[in-house]
Amino acid sequence: MSRSFHTEGIILKNYRFGEIHKGVVFLSPREGLVDAVAFGAYSPKGKLRTVTDPPCMGTLYLYRDPVKGLMKITDMDCRSCFPGIRESVRKFFHASVFLETVLRTFGGEGPFVYRLLGEALSLLEAMPEEKLTELLVQFLFRYLSSAGVAPNLELCGTCGKERSDREPRYYRPGGVELYCGECSHPEDGVIPSGGVSYIQYTHTLPLVEALQVRLEETSLQSLKGYLLSCIQSLSMGSLKSLRTAEGFL
């Protein structure tokens, strides 16, 4: 295997590596999650200083150092650093949830997740803030589907009863399964029938088309709460971005 290679990537996380070096975790469609080092990136004149910050996206040029056991970033051709996301507090926190969701729970399906994350970031940068919740809902459900843990929207998770068109679904906080009214508990959260029908209809549409489908606010907020609970469960409660983003999602 060649020691030098290149791959597409989206930067998910930075951390300090020594005094002036930057640890970089990025998502590659081929390699999955990659932990690499950008040497000198924290120095004032480091050429990789800004292009290796989240959520920059582009082509990374890498070198496998078998002696040190490191992956080095030698260069990056950055296609976008998404300035529109950085300029909006709400967009920034939505992007943080997208990135940390992938960082903490990625288990495969690299090409699909890479396309989903890249498209979500591109749409997030340009879209009006009043549409952010729809994008969050669509991203989270599609991500859960790619991980193989999306809920069955048609059948009750306990009795297997098929859902009627006007029937809501219920969920246990921290769980993924959805239940019919007869199998629900008093403390369960509820997703109105319109919210369930919305996801059934839109989750197979292209993302940009799904965002054109309107949903009333109560159902939208219910879906958001449910899907965020699912992601927290999948990550075993490790998503710090959900705590820091409280009030902005």
Q: For each predicted feature, which ranges?
A:
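Non-catalytic alpha-helical scaffolds and adjoining flexible linkers that form interface surfaces
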Residues: M1-K22, L27-L249
